[in-house]
Design a protein with these regions (language model features):
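Active-site residues of response regulator receiver
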Residues: 67-68, 98
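Receiver (REC) domain active-site loop signature in two-component systems and cognate sites
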Residues: 71
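Acidic, metal-coordinating helix/loop segments flanking the phosphotransfer/catalytic sites
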Residues: 43-64, 128
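CheY-like receiver
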Residues: 126, 131-132, 136-155
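Conserved acidic segment of CheY-like receiver
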Residues: 12-33, 65
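Short, glycine/charged-rich "phosphate-handling" switch motifs in NTP-dependent
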Residues: 115
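A Lys-centered signature of the CheY-like receiver
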Residues: 120
Length: 155
């Protein structure tokens, strides 16, 4: 499903988070429970599990994938590359969700085809705000040609 159809989604928005930090995964899940949007959230622990999950027959393809950069076994950059090269996955909206504020990471993920980059917030309320902002983005604008001006989102 194309990312720009998220805004017109009739059922729940399918969200997938790939993050090796258990505390971050739990906070992420709790934040979505408190946001007043219909979402279904799936969690995976690292890049290998992410790609295995996405390649399963009949697996839920997320509308939005939140992807941590620094994960064991397969990092977020490698996952992003594989997703963008796979015909069945390339249209998934990919949001880099990382503690890194490095200009190099931001530039590299932009060039490799991520749609949005957000830094992990420091508190729960900021997390809820940024997640709601990401889910309610006008994805047509964010996917119709990469624009660095709107790539880095802040809360």
């Amino acid at each position: 499903m194309l990312p720009n159809s998220i805004n017109m989604q009739k059922g729940p928005i399918q969200v997938l988070l790939a993050d090796d930090d258990e505390d971050d995964r739990l906070l992420f899940q709790d934040a979505f429970k408190e946001i007043k949007l219909k979402t279904e959230v799936q969690l995976v622990y690292d890049g290998v599990e992410l790609l295995e999950y996405l390649s399963q027959e009949g697996a839920m393809k997320p509308h939005v994938l939140f992807l941590d950069l620094n994960m064991p076994r397969k990092n977020g950059m490698d996952c992003l590359d594989e997703i963008r090269l796979d015909e069945s996955l390339k249209d998934i909206a990919v949001v880099i969700y990382s503690t890194s504020a490095s200009d190099e990471d931001i530039e590299e993920t932009f060039v490799r085809g991520a749609n949005v980059y957000i830094r992990k917030p420091n508190n729960f309320n900021e997390l809820k705000k940024i997640l709601e902002k990401v889910i309610t983005i006008n994805w047509q604008y964010h996917t119709s040609g990469l624009n660095k001006e709107n790539f880095l989102l802040s809360f």
